[in-house]
């Protein structure tokens, strides 16, 4: 015999919890985004995503499974006609939870749960563009390195000594500049 899950239920009883999630899912599919408590939003996410997965399949059997949960036929029609086909090429991740300010009165942590409206094709195109740019950048970089190596090869020993002297002079100036504020503070004391 299957044992019931342990722990608190939303609404107190199993039937009330089912009703709460059915109503939340109906509102989510009807409006696209809803504000609720953070714990209800986290519990609603897998529930709603399974319904969207049924809508993606689009068969009569899947429609009847969704109608067992969502009683509003207009919302079910919207789910199967618009939402399901919209996510046809997306594997999961149909909802997003955004935490908001706590509720006034009881200070309960609140969140917005919404259907993700961005297509994954745009993100894939951006990723492909970045990959192509990163592949083009290393191809251009070795050519620049060869130029630098050629210039370094042409430098004479005298030029190298002059460069070392310039570097030492710059280091001396920065050290003196760093000591200057300390000297001014000592004069003030």
Curated annotation (Swiss-Prot):
Alphabetical keyword list: Ribonucleoprotein, Ribosomal protein
InterPro entries membership: Ribosomal_bL17 (IPR000456), Ribosomal_bL17_CS (IPR047859), Ribosomal_bL17_sf (IPR036373)
Biological process annotations from GO: translation
Alphabetized Gene3D superfamilies for the sequence: Ribosomal protein L17 (3.90.1030.10)
GO molecular function, one term: structural constituent of ribosome
Protein name: Large ribosomal subunit protein bL17
Superkingdom of origin organism: Bacteria
GO CC, one annotated term: cytosolic large ribosomal subunit
Similarity section: Belongs to the bacterial ribosomal protein bL17 family.
Oligomer status and interactors: Part of the 50S ribosomal subunit. Contacts protein L32.
GN (gene name): rplQ
Record Pfam families: Ribosomal_L17
Organism ancestry: Bacteria, Bacillati, Actinomycetota, Actinomycetes, Mycobacteriales
């Amino acid at each position: 015999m299957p044992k019931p899950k342990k722990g608190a239920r939303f609404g107190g009883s199993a039937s009330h919890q089912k009703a709460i999630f059915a109503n939340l899912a109906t509102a989510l599919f009807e409006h696209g985004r809803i504000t609720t408590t953070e714990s209800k939003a986290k519990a609603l996410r897998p529930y709603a995503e399974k319904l969207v997965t049924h809508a993606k399949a689009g068969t009569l059997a899947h429609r009847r499974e969704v109608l067992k949960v969502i009683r509003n036929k207009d919302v079910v029609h919207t789910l199967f006609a618009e939402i399901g086909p919209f996510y046809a090429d997306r594997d999961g991740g149909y909802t997003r939870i955004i935490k908001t300010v706590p509720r006034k009165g009881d200070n309960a942590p609140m969140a917005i749960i919404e259907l993700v409206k961005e297509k994954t094709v745009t993100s894939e195109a951006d990723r492909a563009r970045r990959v192509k740019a990163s592949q083009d950048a290393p191809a251009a970089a070795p050519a620049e390195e060869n130029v630098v190596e050629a210039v370094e090869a042409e430098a004479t020993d005298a030029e190298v000594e002059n460069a070392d002297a310039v570097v030492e002079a710059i280091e001396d100036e920065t050290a003196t500049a760093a000591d200057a504020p300390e000297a001014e503070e000592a004069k003030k004391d």
